[in-house]
UniProtKB/Swiss-Prot annotation:
Gene: mutM
Subunit note: Monomer.
Cofactor remark: Binds 1 zinc ion per subunit.
Protein name per the record: Formamidopyrimidine-DNA glycosylase
ZnF bounds (FPG-type): 236-270
Record's keyword annotation contains Phosphoprotein: no
Cofactor: Zn(2+)
Alphabetical list of HAMAP family matching this protein: Fapy_DNA_glycosyl (MF_00103)
Family from the record: Belongs to the FPG family.
Positions of the catalytic residues: 2-3, 57, 260
Domain of life: Bacteria
Binding of DNA, residues: 90, 109, 151
Length: 271
């Protein structure tokens, strides 16, 4: 599943081709995604795209009439292509631009979404209760400590809670906890401020580095230009259960936590 770095890399890839361009058509071949795709042709045709933003794992394509809210789901991708590019399997939506290009949404598993919001997007039900962005100053040790106060949940589950901080999915939660030396099952409310300070710094550093490297390539993710990400070569624990720890040589443990695979080093990461 694309996580925050992959979505940000996609945003950076498509924005230069979209901003200040006029929409001349919207082609919906299959509107049966995670939620039905609304028929917004009348609203969006003729509109100029003002900016392309990201909130958590959502891409926001702004026009004066409203905002398209796009989520890549488990396997979705957005590509900038010439108008006459042949349609392939799972190419569900084309946003057609006056500059001779299209923004094409492809999603084999159809867990993605393309929605429309005419209200301030912060009021949309999908966005209204989201926590702070991890790469902004709003995500800091004071905020995290307050959010974790009294919580008995495992710290990894809290890191992946979008009400606490957005966009830290399974890959980067595993990696950040390893880098911070914190066991993923550690009780969140009992982690001291010093360790939380390290954790916040590692979350920021790892996400920023993943964006710089072009995202993590697993089964489905490619950049907006079709190129793979390269951060998978840098993973220390995710997907490496049973292999040796890159720090101490101990065998990495693999468990299920919150229905997600969790990999950690029992020597380097403590409760």
């Amino acid at each position: 599943m694309p996580e925050l770095p992959e979505v940000e890399v996609t945003r950076q890839g498509i924005a230069p081709y979209l901003v200040e361009q006029t929409v001349i058509d919207l082609v919906i071949r299959n509107g049966s995604l995670r939620w039905p795709v609304p028929d917004i042709a009348k609203q969006i045709i003729g509109q100029v795209i003002r900016q392309v933003r990201r909130r958590a794992k959502y891409l926001l394509i702004d026009t004066d009439a409203g905002t398209s809210i796009v989520h890549l789901g488990m396997s979705g991708s957005l590509r900038i292509l010439p108008h006459d590019t042949p349609v392939e399997k799972h190419d569900h939506i084309d946003l057609v631009l006056a500059n001779g290009r299209i923004l094409r949404f492809n999603d084999p598993r159809r867990f993605g979404a393309w929605l429309w919001c005419e209200l301030p997007e912060e009021a949309h039900p999908l966005l209204a209760k989201l926590g702070p962005e991890p790469l902004t100053n709003a995500f800091n040790v004071k905020q995290l400590a307050a959010a974790l106060t009294g919580k008995k949940k495992a710290i990894k589950l809290c890191l992946m809670d979008n009400h606490i901080v957005v966009g830290v999915g399974n890959i980067y939660a595993n990696e950040a906890l390893f880098a911070a030396g914190i066991h993923p099952e550690a009780e969140a409310g009992k982690i001291d401020i010093e360790r939380l300070t390290v954790l916040v710094a590692e979350v920021k550093q790892i996400l920023a580095h993943a964006i710089k490297q072009g995202g993590t390539t697993l089964k489905d993710f490619t950049n907006a230009d079709g190129k793979p990400g390269y951060f998978a070569q840098k993973l220390h624990v995710y997907g490496r259960g049973g292999e040796t720890c890159t720090s101490c040589g101990n065998l990495l443990s693999e468990i299920r936590l919150g229905q997600r695979t969790t990999v950690f080093c029992g020597i380097c990461q403590t409760r």
